[in-house]
């Protein structure tokens, strides 16, 4: 690399990744094949439009690449339609929402503080700025989605769109129940599986593809691909919607909302990386990987419970869980800082009905996808939980330094993908 300053920074990041235990639920480690595609000469090509309908010449090769990504995405998810151009999950959500409803319409999404996402109706997001947003949450007793309460809220506010999905919810979501509620109030249903896509495509979680009108996802997290977004549709893909006062098929409306509605030229190098990741996820080994992710995550959660900690909702069905730090009398922000000092990386997280500000929070979010990509098994994951608890309980700087040395030695024995 000619730029020595940047090369040194990248090498520093590579060292950080090697020597840290990565537990951020939205992060993962991509394969060499994905990195090669994303770092390829495809970054040179501008390709506004869609395959065979570009606004630039010389696109016959990237047409084949995008078509490959589309066909693999459709096969992987069992979808009738796929748009692989969204630059991120948030942009996928924006395009999907705009294809279904118009500004000022009502949306009903999961409360951010209960595990939802900014793009599901938060006032600081386009979804709360451009639309009349309402929210549902979890039961105070079980900390699990109360579908009867979702139905009650939907009947009261009569939304045009219901969004099912979450960013810090550890239980499987029943998409069919959401569709029943949406149909009762004549609303569209958008399912956001950004966090659980890997579990959906391997059959560990139920699929929303033929249940929802549209499904969105990121391509990283549990899919283990490059950072990016994806929009999918099943049997509803050819339904007619009113888009800009014209009758259009749903897939046509989505295409228009991605380009030119919210984006210009697609990132062809990233789309190539998506194609690689979809191909990897179609292999039998990927199902084994996801099975291990679930096993490792459950093992960590169960160990925390055995040590007296409270896990939000009592456990996990997926790749993440939330730990209530009340037993220690510290905040999520405190925990995040202490753990980073011993090379354990995770994030502070508010818990349902939290009395603390999100910048402080009462909990932490722990994800098992990235450590599983490095080859950690169930026993290794329990050892990770032990490191966390030791670091959070100690008051000694000497002990923290000792734990850091142990963490570096432990995690460095596992290869990066």
From Swiss-Prot:
Cofactor requirements of the protein: pyridoxal 5'-phosphate
The keyword Amino-acid biosynthesis is assigned to this record: yes
A biological-process GO annotation: tetrahydrofolate interconversion
Listed Pfam families: SHMT
Stored InterPro entries: PyrdxlP-dep_Trfase, PyrdxlP-dep_Trfase_major, PyrdxlP-dep_Trfase_small, Ser_HO-MeTrfase, Ser_HO-MeTrfase-like, Ser_HO-MeTrfase_PLP_BS, SHMT-like_dom
Source species, domain of life: Bacteria
Paired cysteines (S-S): none
EC number(s) given by UniProt: 2.1.2.1
Gene3D superfamilies, alphabetized: Aspartate Aminotransferase, domain 1, Type I PLP-dependent aspartate aminotransferase-like (Major domain)
Chief subcellular location: cytoplasm
Record keyword Transferase present: yes
N6-(pyridoxal phosphate)lysine: residues carrying this PTM: 221
Subunit structure: Homodimer.
Annotated family: Belongs to the SHMT family.
Name of protein: Serine hydroxymethyltransferase
Gene field: glyA
């Amino acid at each position: 690399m000619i730029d020595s300053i940047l090369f040194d920074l990248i090498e520093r990041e590579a060292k950080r990744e090697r020597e840290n235990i990565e537990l951020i639920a939205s992060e993962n480690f991509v394969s060499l094949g994905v990195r090669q595609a994303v770092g390829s000469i495809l970054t040179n090509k501008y390709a506004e439009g869609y395959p065979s309908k570009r606004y630039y010449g010389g696109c016959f090769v990237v047409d084949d690449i995008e078509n490959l990504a589309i066909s693999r995405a459709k096969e992987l998810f069992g979808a009738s339609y796929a748009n692989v151009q969204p630059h991120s999950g948030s942009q996928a959500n924006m395009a999907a929402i705009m294809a279904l409803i118009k500004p000022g319409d009502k949306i009903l999404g999961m409360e951010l503080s209960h595990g939802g996402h900014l793009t599901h109706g938060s006032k600081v997001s386009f979804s709360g700025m451009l639309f009349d947003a309402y929210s549902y949450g979890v039961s105070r007793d079980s900390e699990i989605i109360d579908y009867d309460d979702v139905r009650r809220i939907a009947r009261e506010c009569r939304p045009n769109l219901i969004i099912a999905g979450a960013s810090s919810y550890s239980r499987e979501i029943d998409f069919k129940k959401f569709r029943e509620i949406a149909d009762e109030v004549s609303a569209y249903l958008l399912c956001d599986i950004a966090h659980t896509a890997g579990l959906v495509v391997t059959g560990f979680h139920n699929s929303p593809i033929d249940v929802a009108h549209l499904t969105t996802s990121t391509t990283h997290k549990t899919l283990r691909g490059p950072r990016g977004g994806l929009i999918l549709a099943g049997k509803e893909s050819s339904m007619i919607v009113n888009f800009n006062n014209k009758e259009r098929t749903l897939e046509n409306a989505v295409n228009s909302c991605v380009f030119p509605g919210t984006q210009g030229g697609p990132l062809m190098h990233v789309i190539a990386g998506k194609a690689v990741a979809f191909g990897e996820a179609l292999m039998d080994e990927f199902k084994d990987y996801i099975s291990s992710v679930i096993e490792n995550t459950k093992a960590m959660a169960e160990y925390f419970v055995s040590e007296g900690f409270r896990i939000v909702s009592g456990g996990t069905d997926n790749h993440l869980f939330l730990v209530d730090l009340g037993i220690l009398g510290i905040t999520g922000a405190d925990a995040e800082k202490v753990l980073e000092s011993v090379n354990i990386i995770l994030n502070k997280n508010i818990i349902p009905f939290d009395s603390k500000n999100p910048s402080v929070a009462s909990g932490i979010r722990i994800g098992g996808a990235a450590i599983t990509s490095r080859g950690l098994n169930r026993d290794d994951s329990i050892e990770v939980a032990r490191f966390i608890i030791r670091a959070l309980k100690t008051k000694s700087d000497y002990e923290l330094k000792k734990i850091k040395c142990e963490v570096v030695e432990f995690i460095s024995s596992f290869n990066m993908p």
